[in-house]
């Protein structure tokens, strides 16, 4: 597969997942797009072989998570302020926007595990490998993240019957 075909394959297969994961960390669309581009450039320059598509996906999401952590630690990010005073055009809210807003307001370590578990469908052990933390830590973060969401959303209104 030549470089152009590889780039198209990566963009088609992983761009959405990288953008969504990056946005859960950074809460900024432009920064998430920068992370996506950075990950693709690294992948295209290193030409790594993977055992399976699952290993490739986990490696790519791990690269994205690490790149997000690097941005969050950077001194540049600490010196800039988001444009919170900018006017957002009114748009109809999605039915689950309150839940999504609550998830996005969680601390990054809870937000990442909840995103990977519920939106990407990873198991706790896989999330641990992607984020570089023990499986028990993933379970703890999921439980604490759910508890915070329940407290934010008022509990029963959003709970689904089992």
Annotate each language-model stretch with its function.
Residues 70, 78-103, 123, 162:
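Internal acidic/polar
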Residues 65, 69, 131-155:
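DNA-recognition helix of helix-turn-helix
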């Amino acid at each position: 597969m030549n470089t152009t075909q590889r780039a198209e394959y990566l963009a088609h297969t992983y761009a959405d997942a990288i953008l969504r994961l990056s946005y859960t960390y950074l809460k900024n669309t432009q920064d998430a797009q920068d992370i996506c581009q950075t990950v693709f450039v690294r992948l295209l320059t290193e030409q790594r072989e993977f055992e399976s598509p699952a290993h490739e996906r986990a490696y790519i999401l791990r690269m994205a998570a690490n790149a997000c952590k690097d941005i969050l630690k950077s001194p540049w990010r600490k010196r800039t302020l988001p444009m919170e005073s900018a006017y957002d055009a009114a748009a109809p809210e999605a039915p689950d926007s309150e839940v999504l807003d609550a998830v996005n307001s969680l601390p990054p370590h809870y937000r990442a595990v909840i995103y990977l578990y519920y939106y990407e469908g990873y198991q706790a052990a896989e999330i641990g490998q992607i984020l570089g933390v023990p499986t028990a830590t993933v379970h703890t973060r999921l439980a604490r993240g759910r508890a915070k969401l329940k407290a934010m959303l008022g509990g029963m209104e959003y709970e689904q019957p089992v």
